[in-house]
Regions:
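Terminal interaction-prone segments of large eukaryotic proteins
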Residues: 1-161
């Protein structure tokens, strides 16, 4: 019983839950090449590498981008085996207005629409951003960038919106 309550507390402390499954591998370069005429895929790999590098460098995130990196910096990012792994769902945990723990499940096929707090400030800033989740993925990333502290492989979870 005590172990069960410890596991429950650990689950509540986690912001989200995403499968570790590697049952649906996607070769990222083949995936983009096969869909090159779809505007959604325009600049996908450079943007994804920018995102990974920004996270690895612990840069501030404004909710839209970490900023642009030059090609030389992007080339320091390696996606292990050129594989990303598709997941069917992700569960997002949160605290409700009445201080209860709750969560929502996002599924790109059935419940793809999300709303997040906007980082924008100012008189005409919108309080929320809205997006549609196209895919849920995880992968392993390695970077040899000089400023990345740990030169080991890092698991990266990401939503494609």
């Amino acid at each position: 019983m005590a172990q069960e309550s410890i596991n429950m507390q650990q689950d509540l402390d986690v912001c989200y839950q995403l499968s570790n499954s590697q049952k649906e591998p996607v070769n990222i370069y083949t995936y983009v090449r096969e869909n090159q005429n779809d505007p959604v895929f325009k600049g996908f790999i450079p943007k994804l590498k920018d995102h990974f590098l920004g996270r690895l460098l612990n840069q501030g995130y404004d909710g839209d981008t970490y900023g642009e990196f030059i090609e030389e910096e992007r080339n320091t990012v390696r996606i292990a085996g050129e594989q990303i792994y598709r997941c069917k769902t992700i569960r997002i945990n949160y605290t409700t207005y009445d201080v209860r723990c709750d969560g929502d499940t996002i599924n790109p096929r059935t419940y793809p629409d999300i709303m997040v707090k906007s980082p924008e400030i100012g008189l005409h800033a919108q309080p929320f951003w809205y997006a549609r989740v196209i895919g849920i993925f995880h992968t392993s990333v390695l970077s040899c960038h000089l400023e990345v502290a740990e030169k080991s492989t890092h698991r990266m979870d990401f939503l494609w919106v």
